[in-house]
Amino acid sequence: MDQASTPRPRSTGVLLHPTALPGSPVCGSFGEPSRRWLRLLADHNIGVWQMLPLAPPDPTGSPYSSPSCFALNPWFLDAADLAAEQFISAEQLDGLPGAEAPSHGVDSLSFAQACERSAALSEALLQSWPDQSAERQQAFAQWCSEQTWLEDHVRFRVLHDQHQQAWWTWPQPLAQHQSAALERWARDHQDALQKERLTQWQLDRQWQQIRTLAADLGILLFGDLPFYVSADSADVWSHRSLFTIAADGRLSTQSGVPPDYFSETGQLWGSPVYRWWRHRLTRFSWWRKRIARQRQLMDLLRLDHFRALAMFWAVPGGDTTAEHGQWQPSPGASLLRKLRSDAGGALPLIAEDLGVITPDVEALRDGFALPGMKVLQFAFDGQSDNPYLPENIDGSRWVVYTGTHDNATTLGWWQ
């Protein structure tokens, strides 16, 4: 079907989300904690840093059900770096929530404290912005003009904070993303919108500095892309026609996986699925922009639930279990061809192909020369033909893990 990509050299990596890095109040950041971590990896000849999605989390703290496929999590903004560059003052830095707390060294993260600190830091950025140089203001304006996703994100964020409910419950002209109504509303919320823009710009600036350091140290940054999108997100709100969701938030079809050995009722994820025929009409424009944004942030990208690019399990919208869904085809090959063309060569994607994988999924993965995944914790069931045993792993196009974020730690597994 397609030419194989150039084999990647063998390397070793570590999977660790930036929230887990020590050295900042509340949680890890895109500042010195990430720089120190990269230097530690380089000192030990570790060439890949893999992480979970960097997107804003949902209310439970999960980045896999984010309110934005394009934005970055404000928790990661490093206040000390902003103060050192005089984007905020030393007094503002000292006054941030959590500033008096000891450096992150506990085994849990307070989501409420992380949100409180990031909100206060965003406010400090806004208050200090009029004092910034013309050069900085111009750089900010230029960046904003290049981010086609930004205005939908900042409007969604401010509206969500204002109404504290899902978008389909907002006043109808706003809920239906009507341009004239949004423009009128935006005129009364300029400061709040500007605060969100500044936050995303600074996050992007700090992460690009991390990218530069990683490249200088010879370390690849390896991100993670959830397949489906939260119903209550800027993406679905602003592109509702691309998803199986009605104006009142009801899903005509929802995502999940069918019953199997582990679950008699399957898994019901509850997010809308894609109206693939509409994506085809746009030549997959939204998907291509989504991947292009991730390529600005990462060198490699794991595509979660890769099997849904071949066939996906579609569950009726009103169902409470995944039992009565049906398999439906996806235009995965067409999408991957577009993405490969955009990339100008080999796709920087890793297929998450764990679980029950059928020949059509394997053919799609192999046809585009995408590496798959192997997990060593799955290997030792006493069966000599177990596909996860190292001696049974054929070829070199695999990412092999001891375990992933879905598994126990290796120590916990062993015990």
Question: Where are the model-predicted features located?
Answer:
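Conserved, well-ordered alpha-helix/loop/beta-strand core segments that scaffold catalytic motifs
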Residues: L41, E196-V229
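Catalytic domains of carbohydrate-active enzymes, especially glycoside hydrolases
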Residues: E32-P57, R293-L300
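Outer-envelope exported proteins of Gram-negative bacteria
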Residues: L52, L220-F222, P226, L300, ...
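Alpha-amylase-like alpha-glycosidases and glucanotransferases acting on alpha-linked glucans and related
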Residues: A4-R10, L15-H17, G23-V26, T60-D204, ...
